[in-house]
Amino acid sequence: MTDFFFEYIFPLIIIALKVVAITIPLILCVAYLTYAERRVIGLMQLRCGPNVVGPFGLLQPIADAVKLLFKEPIIPINADKILFILAPMITFILSLIGWAVIPFSKGVVLADINVGVLYILAISSLSVYGIIIAGWASNSKYAFLGAIRSSAQMISYEVSMGFVIITVLLTTGTLNLSGIIEAQRTMPWWIDLMLLPMGIVFFISVLAETNRLPFDLPEAESELVAGYNVEYSSMGFALFFLGEYANMILVSAMTTTFFLGGYLPPFNISWLDCIPGFFWFVFKVGFLLFCFLWIRATLPRYRYDQLMRLGWKVFLPLTLFWVVLVSSVLFYTDNLPNV
């Protein structure tokens, strides 16, 4: 019995504790990211933002959560009730399970699998299903149009994101996310410089993937009222909201891992190794999240045809050309990784 416990039950308990240790801080980060967004945008617009609930407004996310929790969940009479309820759950759960392969520091990762990049791509591709189901199940033309926009937008930018990730794989030679970070420790500076344009393309693409300004067409208030979540209230709306912000943190972590060295110190400065890698990871993710908020506060929304044109006529040929360029340069300089 003891052998059975230590061989089968104990590993499951350890995995469950690791999941809780990642999920609870992540949900708190999502809650306070909404607070940070309102404060940053308020300061950029020369106003205070939330500053009443608690000192400096720090209890505002808790007040918002309590308000949404006690609101009445209203399901439209013609909606597909089961799918209507499942859609926000799918969106929120998929935004959390992507964190299983993200390395927070050296050796600190829930599942250090050798196909981590494929896992992340699969999860990011599945996340659109929650939005499509919500648009269909709501039985509303605004919600359905928002869902169609979201699916077209994600398909358009997944292609260029895939080519960008191929350039990263060409330089690192591994699908393991920890391996990608460690490969950047010894990577020549000119390869980092060659990947810089792809890092910018990747960041713009994840703006479109997460439906953030200037690409928030699926929920454009002036055109679609609120898009795919127009019929949602109470915790259904809250789960969509949490899913969007959890996705923001996830794609910031992906960008950090692929292009900013993950938990490595900036520019591989050796005397900064004394600072824990987790600090550098959080610092880089926080910087990218600030860029998300900065962009929302400063840029206007694209038209839908401009969004599609950027994805298919600019990013797709550019990333395809860059894959050929990077592979050619690495081949002729004999810097292709040994796999």
From Swiss-Prot:
It is a multi-pass membrane protein. Pfam families: NADHdh. Its EC number is 7.1.1.-. It is found in: Cell inner membrane. The keyword Cell wall biogenesis/degradation does not apply. The chain crosses the membrane at residues 9-29, 82-102, 115-135, 161-181, 187-207, 235-255, 275-295, 311-331. PANTHER family: NADH DEHYDROGENASE SUBUNIT 1 (PTHR11432), NADH-UBIQUINONE OXIDOREDUCTASE CHAIN 1 (PTHR11432:SF3). NDH-1 shuttles electrons from NADH, via FMN and iron-sulfur (Fe-S) centers, to quinones in the respiratory chain. The immediate electron acceptor for the enzyme in this species is believed to be ubiquinone. Couples the redox reaction to proton translocation (for every two electrons transferred, four hydrogen ions are translocated across the cytoplasmic membrane), and thus conserves the redox energy in a proton gradient. This subunit may bind ubiquinone. Belongs to the complex I subunit 1 family. This is NADH-quinone oxidoreductase subunit H. It comes from Rickettsia akari (strain Hartford).
